[in-house]
């Protein structure tokens, strides 16, 4: 079963939430003693995941990949999370 753009974006919400929580100083996702290096790696992984999701598009007319990149659905929360994550990495790298 091919997922819809809406389903793909809904599945990416966890990455948005994690990036925003870390940026806001909420580290409850992590066990005590996690280093800044580990936190940064998680932020980077989630930024990369969101970038892959936002770039999703079919390669040709026969490709069933949903066209997230070309969709007119509001993706601002995802693009904002990417920018927030990148800034966090700059500030805490």
Residue ranges and their predicted role:
Residues 5-8, 50, 74, 78:
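Generic alpha-helix initiation/capping and coil-helix boundary signal
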């Amino acid at each position: 079963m091919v997922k819809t753009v809406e389903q793909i974006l809904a599945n990416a919400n966890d990455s948005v939430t994690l990036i925003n929580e870390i940026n806001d100083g909420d580290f409850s996702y992590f066990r005590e003693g996690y280093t800044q290096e580990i936190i940064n790696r998680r932020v980077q992984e989630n930024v990369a995941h969101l970038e892959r999701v936002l770039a999703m598009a079919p390669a040709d007319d026969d490709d069933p990949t949903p066209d997230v990149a070309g969709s007119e659905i509001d993706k601002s929360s995802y693009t904002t999370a990417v920018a927030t994550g990148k800034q966090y990495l700059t500030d805490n790298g």
